[in-house]
Structure formats: C-alpha cells, structure tokens
Amino acid sequence: MIWKRHLTLDELNATSDNTMVAHLGIVYTRLGDDVLEAEMPVDIRTHQPFGLLHGGASAALAETLGSMAGFMMTRDGQCVVGTELNATHHRPVSEGKVRGVCQPLHLGRQNQSWEIVVFDEQGRRCCTCRLGTAVLG
C-alpha cells in the first residue's frame, strides 16, 4: 500500500460535506493499494446545456480524486495543492454515472503527478486527465 495516511471510505466521503464535491454528487467508492476511485452522477448538476456531461464536471471529478490521493501521500503538517490539470475528452455521456480511477504517475517529495481516467457505466474511457500537485509543508 502506498498511502501514508490511512483513511476509510466513510472518512474520505465525510471530507466532502458542504463542498462542491458533495454538490456534484461525487462519492469515493474504492481505496485500493495504489488506486482511489469515485463515482459521479451524470444529471442536471453535471450536464452542459446540450444534455451531455460537462467537461468541467469531469475535470472536477479528476481534481477531486487526484487532490485527495495526493493528500493521502503526505505526512502530518503537509498538504497538497493542484498546479496543473489536463483533460482529454474522448466520448460523450448523457446519463447514468461515471467512475473516476486515480493512480500515481510520479510521487516525489515536492511534487506528484496523477492519472485519472473517467469511465462510463459500460466501462468505456470517456476522459483522461493528468493532475500535477505540489507538496507544501
């Protein structure tokens, strides 16, 4: 297991109370040895005007996952902040849920890189994101 902080899914989800994460309906669903996953509904909260999943919602899911994963790689007195987010959208989604899967690309002392892949309910890749974070403290 790569994580330096040991949180349960319930504890992870509690951090979202009264935030944009909760407003978008993002829920952490899996914490593995080197992976963090979450689901987000594709509905009125996450649609763009043409009834498809908004690219910004996919980016919000990615940054949520990468930032939390980055935080779990810090020690007491440290935090992480996002420095760069790149998102490539591959296919539209109009309803249901999407699932984000976050895994590390680089875990340095001062910076981290995370890959977050967003899948639709059929398991098709909808979006590929890369998040860079800086470790502070």
Swiss-Prot record:
Class of the enzyme per the UniProt entry, highest EC level: hydrolase
MF (Gene Ontology): 1,4-dihydroxy-2-naphthoyl-CoA thioesterase activity
Protein keywords: Cytoplasm, Hydrolase
Principal location: cytoplasm
Keyword Hydrolase applies: yes
SUPFAM superfamilies xrefs: Thioesterase/thiol ester dehydrase-isomerase
Function, in words: Required for optimal enterobactin synthesis. Acts as a proofreading enzyme that prevents EntB misacylation by hydrolyzing the thioester bound existing between EntB and wrongly charged molecules.
HAMAP family: Thioesterase_EntH
Protein name as it appears in the record: Proofreading thioesterase EntH
Organism the protein comes from: Escherichia coli O157:H7 (strain EC4115 / EHEC)
